[in-house]
């Protein structure tokens, strides 16, 4: 089974729609630093384009044919809070993460790394940070979090696919990818953000979040095999 996503919406309609919602960064004079998840000076996301696909296969079948196994997709969670078309709430993301943990048979403290949705919007980054702290409690300070959208921008329908690939590679390489462009972390984003440089660490289990406009939330849990 192939699972992933792709999207290419850098066009007048795509950009115009998100601009009319005031979702995009206006840092046009400094585009390389415009996408800055969790930074106090973030002002919206930068649209990107791309794709990411994973090959999903039953474990024994993959072993029998000698496939290279990167990790196990052990849990998923979905929720729809329908709170507001653009303004998020914490209950939907919390439920999505809880469901993924339950499906994987893990506790919050079992997660070593979180690849966040982290779009660089003023409200969204704070909301996700609060949801993470609500679920993970004291473990939040140990949980390493990064948003790779600082480097890629927001791929919209392609974001979950490519960021799942990043999460799988983090487990393979035992390295948390950095969140770039975080100069001054917003104190309201009270999570342990991996900033600037990759962080070599043990990653036994990792979580991937994607939270869409309208309150559509999805979470995956991957584990080292």
Located regions from the model:
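Acidic-glycine-rich active-site phosphate/pyrophosphate-binding loop
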Residues: 19-33, 69, 126-145, 192-196
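Conserved small-residue
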Residues: 18, 55, 73, 111, ...
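Condensing-enzyme catalytic core mediating Claisen C-C bond formation in acyl metabolism
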Residues: 29-104, 113
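Short glycine/threonine-rich loop-to-helix capping motif typified by GTGT followed
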Residues: 82-93, 119-136, 155-162, 195
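Beta-strand segments within the central parallel beta-sheet cores of soluble alpha/beta enzyme folds
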Residues: 1-6, 68-76, 109-116, 143-149, ...
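Conserved beta-strand-centric core segments of catalytic alpha/beta enzyme folds
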Residues: 1-61, 159-225
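Stable alpha-helical structural segments in soluble proteins, enriched in small hydrophobic residues
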Residues: 96-104, 131, 135, 167, ...
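Conserved beta-ketoacyl condensing-enzyme motif
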Residues: 6-17, 108-124
């Amino acid at each position: 089974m192939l699972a992933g996503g792709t999207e290419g919406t850098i066009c007048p309609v795509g950009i115009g729609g998100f601009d009319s919602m005031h979702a995009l960064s206006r840092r046009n004079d400094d585009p390389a630093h415009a996408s800055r998840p969790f930074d106090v000076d973030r002002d919206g996301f930068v649209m990107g384009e791309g794709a990411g696909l994973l090959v999903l296969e039953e474990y024994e079948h993959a072993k029998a044919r000698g496939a290279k196994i990167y990790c196990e997709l052990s849990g998923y969670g979905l929720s729809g809070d329908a709170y507001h078309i653009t303004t998020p709430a914490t209950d939907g993301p919390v439920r999505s993460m809880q469901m993924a943990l339950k499906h994987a048979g893990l506790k919050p403290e079992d997660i070593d790394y979180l690849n966040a949705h982290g779009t660089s919007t003023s409200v969204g980054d704070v909301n996700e940070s609060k949801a993470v702290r609500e679920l993970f409690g004291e473990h939040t300070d140990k949980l390493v979090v990064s948003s790779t959208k600082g480097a890629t921008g927001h791929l919209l329908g392609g974001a979950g696919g490519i960021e799942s690939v990043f999460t799988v590679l983090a487990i393979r390489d035992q390295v948390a990818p950095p969140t770039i462009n975080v100069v001054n972390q917003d104190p309201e984003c009270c999570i342990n953000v991996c900033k600037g440089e990759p962080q070599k660490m043990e990653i036994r289990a990792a979580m991937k979040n994607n939270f869409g406009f309208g309150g559509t939330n999805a979470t995956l849990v991957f584990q080292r095999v």
